[in-house]
Amino acid sequence: MENLLNYVRLRRDIDFSVRPFNEVDMLVCADLSYVDWDGIVEKEEVSLEEACRKYLSLYSEKELKSKYTFSINLPHLIDALQDTIRYGNIKLKNYKKVYSDEDVIQFSVVTLVLPDGSLVLSFSGTDGSITGWKENLMMTYSKDLPCQILAKDYVKETIADIPETSYLFGLKKKKVYPKMYLTGHSKGGNLAMYAYLKNPKLQGYIEGVKSFDGPGFADGFWQGDEDVSKITNYIPKDSIVGRVLDHREQTKVLDAEGSGLVQHDTLMWSVDIKDFNYCDALTKESDDLLEYVNKLLMDRPLEEKERYCHLIGELFDRMEIYTIADLTEFSFKQALSGIKEIRQLNAEEIKFMFEVVKFIAVQSAPILVKGRK
């Protein structure tokens, strides 16, 4: 099966004038938001090639593996983008990163400038930090998270900052707005959708919103009059992340390798020379996983959902678990702290906690083991 990495390597000499920018190229843009461009990409434009080269020079292979626990092939993608005709003229700018354990924020975004001047605003999904996963849990009961507000404001600021262009021999000026797309994978897809939906007066400036296996929204978010005609969510056939919470956008199902949460990795998705390989329907495993997650958490009343999500966060804090990888490698001291915390809970809460930890560990194990090889 050809995947995204193969696609980039095999199409490296074919520029966009020969084979136009497509959904697979958009996924490349979405994945680039996971890269920590801090100190490399700032307000001014820098070429994608140069940014990739600088980034790879900062870290050893071992360091890159530890940074991208859930995106183990991302360093290979960055390497493949260093010297290509297809992506050589793409520029990066306006990288923004906000991280706070205290406020539970894990947010980053970067703007890509395509050769034709189009802008792609790419929002990052969840990294391997527990803070990022706490943020995901908050999405199940909160309608306006700090990361979502940051995404909305970033779009508003980007449109406001479009420079004026002179015409009539310089006597007059006006803004010429380029085509603009919003994209992101996982939570990043949710942020792209949120930023579009919460900027109704700016939707005319946005050509399309491409979410890649992005979750939906908490109960009560949708008001019924939103325009979702420009939003598409691409989800793998075993999808769980891209199906949870409330969705109204159109969905396209992709063929993919692996099973369960493994398919959340975009490098597991099947592509051909100019598009994804699509499926007619989702799998039974996807339906079963969704039913399990809904029974475990999503179908609970709002207040109960919020309380249970707080319990998970408190358990991880007490056990000093800071990354998802820590779940498979915690010490006896951490386990003891967890037991002490759990002993304070009632029987139903204890059962819930074990089910959540088991689900995360079982679904994450194939990814984490692969990343350590």
Report each predicted region and the residues it spans.
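Alpha/beta hydrolase fold serine-hydrolase catalytic domain that processes acyl esters and thioesters
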Residues: M1-F21, C29, Y34-I40, E50-R86, ...
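Active-site-adjacent helix-turn-beta-strand microarchitecture at beta-sheet edges
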Residues: L92
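Short glycine-enriched nucleophile-adjacent loop
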Residues: A192-P200
